[in-house]
């Protein structure tokens, strides 16, 4: 059901035919992706009828009941992407390093798996990107001018929409040299007309010395989710982490 060179993280012919059928009959379409891995959504540009995408990872027996509440507007979504969605998966470090790489000197560690009724030997993967795994690769490559971010990334790490809007204001940063704690407040205000929750994401960009230790330009160090805020309501979130975390 796939063309040569395509993967199961792209549209199959059956899936594309289904999308063609729906978009040919409706002007406003919401696409629901029920999968655990990042999918290649480059096809969205071909379907202006698709107005929104909901990522609903496998959520067990009751997950789709919750999804129904989100689609109906009863529950305001507040989740954020836990990985980077790119426009061409074949160009990712993951795709180019993927394979079955087996050790040839660990026979004593081979174990039988009842799941596949076969023997499983220890394997490994070469991470050619080093520490720049996931979002760190794309954020750093963009900052260094190695990629065009908008041409490469479809949905960034930590991205997510809501039925309302929020404003975040960061307070002064405090540092306790004795405990090594870094702290500050972030005031989140619901500026829309629907109740909802927001997520405060804190990243740091360490100084880099040419020829020194490799460092990504974006590193998630902490995140906090607010309570459900009514329109116009605010909440001050306290952020605190150790300097060793950087």
Where are each of the predicted segments found?
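Hydrophobic residues positioned within well-ordered beta-strands of beta-sheet architectures
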Residues: 182-184, 200, 237-239
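Secreted, periplasmic, or luminal enzymes acting at the cell surface/secretory milieu
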Residues: 34, 38-197
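Hydrophobic helix-and-loop "lid/oligomerization" segment in the mid-to-C-terminal part
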Residues: 1-26, 31-48
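Beta-strand elements of well-folded, non-transmembrane domains
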Residues: 188-192, 206-208, 243-245
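Short acidic, flexible loop segments centered on an aromatic residue
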Residues: 193-218
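Short, intrinsically disordered, charge-balanced linker/junction segments flanking boundaries
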Residues: 1, 39, 138, 240-246
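Intrinsically disordered, low-complexity Pro/Gly/Ser/Thr-rich segments with frequent PxxP/GP/PP motifs
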Residues: 211-246
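Short beta-alpha connecting loops at secondary-structure transitions
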Residues: 3-7, 49-57, 117-120, 214-228
């Amino acid at each position: 059901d796939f063309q040569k060179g395509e993967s199961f993280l792209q549209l199959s012919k059956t899936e594309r035919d289904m999308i063609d059928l729906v978009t040919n009959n409706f002007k406003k379409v919401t696409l629901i992706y029920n999968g655990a891995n990042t999918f290649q959504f480059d096809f969205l540009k071909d379907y202006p009828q698709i107005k929104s995408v909901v990522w609903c990872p496998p959520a067990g027996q009751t997950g789709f009941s919750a999804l129904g509440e989100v689609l109906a507007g009863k529950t305001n979504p507040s989740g954020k992407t836990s990985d980077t969605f790119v426009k061409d998966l074949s160009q990712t470090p993951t795709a180019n390093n993927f394979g079955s790489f087996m050790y040839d000197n660990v026979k004593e560690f081979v174990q039988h798996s009842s799941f596949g009724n076969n023997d499983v030997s220890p394997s490994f993967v070469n991470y050619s990107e080093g520490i720049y795994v996931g979002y760190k690769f794309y954020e750093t490559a963009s900052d260094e001018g190695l990629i065009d971010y908008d041409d490469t990334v479809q949905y960034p790490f930590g991205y997510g929409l809501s039925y309302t809007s929020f404003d975040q204001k960061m307070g002064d940063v405090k540092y306790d040299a004795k405990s090594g704690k870094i702290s500050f407040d972030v005031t989140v205000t619901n500026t829309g007309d629907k109740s909802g929750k927001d997520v405060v994401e804190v990243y740091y960009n360490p100084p880099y010395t040419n020829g020194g230790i490799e460092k990504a330009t974006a590193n998630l160090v902490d995140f906090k989710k607010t309570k459900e805020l009514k329109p116009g309501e605010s909440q001050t979130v306290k952020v605190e982490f150790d300097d060793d975390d950087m």
